[in-house]
């Protein structure tokens, strides 16, 4: 399933209907008074959160959204009908911004939450409203006002419990395919994952949603690589699983350096990101050199002032996966580690500046 992260749409609320100029035309009443009805109010444009939606895909193809105008007033004191609100359904986690100013309008998360993004125009008054003792036959009525019109930017932040972060090609897509039924595109080159993938993991009698966040690189906080486009998805995750490649990293890189570089990017984008609980997983330990690098990293991180829980895993053989998922489940549901486990308490990593 493709996740559309950001779309720009144009919304136009309905105009108010015009008031009517009309007169009573009844038998035996030669000089009937004014009888022009009021115009109906224009329809609002309303965003409504729909928990059944998970993407903004529909708005990629239909970007113009116009609500109906109110009907004009009529004779015999008949008012025009109000326009029915135009409801645009969006998934939970949709952030609404003004396209012209960049101003944050709302962050929509709760099911059935409603937001009026364009207010309909007010209906005009008919001439019956303007009759006075000195002017009993007003020949004018009020026009309806125009409905609001604006451009909006909708951004989707995935609502996942756990975010899997790391350098491109660290094994994130392989991991999520191993622990859930998700089947992301996987290949041996960076940026295979161009959109976030979601998987549901069953843990004991509970479940949680995992998001495979596309690869981050140095400079991501400034938009490098796939930068800002994906860092926003990390913000709502409660726990981060940080993957580092144990075998064959590029020249000049190491598992420890990768870990610190990504945490630095998280901190530069938003200080609260680097403070989220993290579990570090060294991948590809089916390769001997990766296992050795992982053991070395585990010992080094155990000596830190704030120890970081380190797991050695292989998505190919499945080794270490149950222990990793157990650690994630405990972190989410604040359970104590099982007796005899090797895991250490979760640390909140500090990015090195």
Curated annotation (Swiss-Prot):
Any one Gene Ontology BP term: ribosome biogenesis
Residue sites binding GTP per the record: 166-173, 191-195, 212-215, 283-286, 314-316
Keyword Magnesium in annotation: yes
Cofactor(s) in the UniProt record: Mg(2+)
GO-annotated molecular function: GTP binding; GTPase activity; magnesium ion binding
Domain OBG-type G residue range list: 160-333
E.C. designation(s): 3.6.5.-
Obg domain location: 1-159
Residues reported to bind Mg(2+): 173, 193
Localization (cell): Cytoplasm
Domain of life the protein comes from: Bacteria
One Gene Ontology term, aspect cellular component: cytoplasm
InterPro entries referenced in this protein's UniProt entry, alphabetically: G_OBG, GTP-bd, GTP-bd_Obg/CgtA, GTP1-OBG_CS, GTP1_OBG_dom, GTP1_OBG_dom_sf, OBG_GTPase, P-loop_NTPase
CDD domains xrefs: Obg
Keywords: Cytoplasm, GTP-binding, Hydrolase, Magnesium, Metal-binding, Nucleotide-binding
Assigned protein family: Belongs to the TRAFAC class OBG-HflX-like GTPase superfamily. OBG GTPase family.
Summary of subunit composition and partner proteins: Monomer.
Alphabetical list of PANTHER family matching this protein: DEVELOPMENTALLY REGULATED GTP-BINDING PROTEIN-RELATED, MITOCHONDRIAL RIBOSOME-ASSOCIATED GTPASE 2
Role, per record: An essential GTPase which binds GTP, GDP and possibly (p)ppGpp with moderate affinity, with high nucleotide exchange rates and a fairly low GTP hydrolysis rate. Plays a role in control of the cell cycle, stress response, ribosome biogenesis and in those bacteria that undergo differentiation, in morphogenesis control.
NCBIfam families recorded: Obg_CgtA (TIGR02729), PRK12296.1 (NF008954), PRK12297.1 (NF008955), PRK12299.1 (NF008956)
Protein's name in the database: GTPase Obg
Species this chain originates from: Anaeromyxobacter sp. (strain Fw109-5)
């Amino acid at each position: 399933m493709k996740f559309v992260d950001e779309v720009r749409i144009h919304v136009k609320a309905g105009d108010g209907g015009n008031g009517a100029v009309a007169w009573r035309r009844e038998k035996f009443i030669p000089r009937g008074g004014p009888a022009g009805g009021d115009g109906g109010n224009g329809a609002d444009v309303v965003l409504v959160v729909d928990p059944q939606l998970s993407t903004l895909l529909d708005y990629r193809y239909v970007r113009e959204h116009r609500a109906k105008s109110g009907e004009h007033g009529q004779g015999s004191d008949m008012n025009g009908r109000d326009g029915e609100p135009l409801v645009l359904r969006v998934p939970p986690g949709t952030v609404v911004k003004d396209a012209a100013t960049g101003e944050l309008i709302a962050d929509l998360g709760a099911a059935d939450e409603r937001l009026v993004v364009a207010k309909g125009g007010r209906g005009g008054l008919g001439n019956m409203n303007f009759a006075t003792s000195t002017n009993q036959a007003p020949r004018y009525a009020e026009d309806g006002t125009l409905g609001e019109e604006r451009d909006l930017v909708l951004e989707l932040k995935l609502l996942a419990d756990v975010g899997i972060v790391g350098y491109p090609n660290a094994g994130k897509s392989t991991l999520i395919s191993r622990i859930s039924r998700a089947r992301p595109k996987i290949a041996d080159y960076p940026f295979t994952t161009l959109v976030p993938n979601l998987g549901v993991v069953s843990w004991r009698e509970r479940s949680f949603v995992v998001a495979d966040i596309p690869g981050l690189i140095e400079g991501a906080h400034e938009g490098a690589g796939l930068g800002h486009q994906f860092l926003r998805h990390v913000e709502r995750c409660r726990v981060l699983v940080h993957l580092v490649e144990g075998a064959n990293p590029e020249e000049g890189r190491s598992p420890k350096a990768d870990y610190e570089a990504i945490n630095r990017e998280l901190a530069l984008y938003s200080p609260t990101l680097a403070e989220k609980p993290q579990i570090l997983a060294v991948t590809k330990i089916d390769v001997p050199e990766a296992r050795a690098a992982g053991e070395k990293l585990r010992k080094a991180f155990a000596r830190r002032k704030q120890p970081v829980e380190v797991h050695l895993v292989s998505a190919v053989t499945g080794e270490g996966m149950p222990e990793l998922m157990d650690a994630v489940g405990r972190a989410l549901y604040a359970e104590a580690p099982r007796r005899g486990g090797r895991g250490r308490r979760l640390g909140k990593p500090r990015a090195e500046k």
